[in-house]
Amino acid sequence: MAVVPIRIVGDPVLHTATTPVTVAADGSLPADLAQLIATMYDTMDAANGVGLAANQIGCSLRLFVYDCAADRAMTARRRGVVINPVLETSEIPETMPDPDTDDEGCLSVPGESFPTGRAKWARVTGLDADGSPVSIEGTGLFARMLQHETGHLDGFLYLDRLIGRYARNAKRAVKSHGWGVPGLSWLPGEDPDPFGH
């Protein structure tokens, strides 16, 4: 099991768009990609996350892993990897997010969560770990995760989507933790679980 540190908001790798994974003419993926995917799964599992983008562990490649239920109350989960994902969503509401149903957290903003407006439905297309085409879609928490992880790969954190008082509260939280600078990380399994799982 290889668990690696998760970068914290302010690290440049989190705020820069990732590079697509190179696919050979025969459709094969780089040989070392399988090890990266295994490390991402191990790290996500140790952190009790529902998703993890490669740049959250310092790798600037366009892929994410997930282990997520359709809704917060459900126990059945979907698990996989998407390489070079392309996101499609329903319309994103223009109203203030509901603090009871739209709360969102992030392993790169450990221990914090803020209401975030997201589309109710999302689909991601890309490649699986074998290089075969994959299309996954969902609503609720699963749709939120798809949008969250592809946002990471585009160089954005969910904090960048916050509006109004939630954006102000997030800025205060980042400042109070001393985040927003390069080089900060936490190690799942060694550092305390910031979300209290």
From Swiss-Prot:
Enzymatic class: hydrolase
EC number: 3.5.1.88
Active-site annotation: E149
GO biological process, one term: co-translational protein modification
Pfam families: Pep_deformylase
PANTHER family: PEPTIDE DEFORMYLASE, PEPTIDE DEFORMYLASE, MITOCHONDRIAL
Protein name: Peptide deformylase
Lineage: Bacteria, Bacillati, Actinomycetota, Actinomycetes, Mycobacteriales
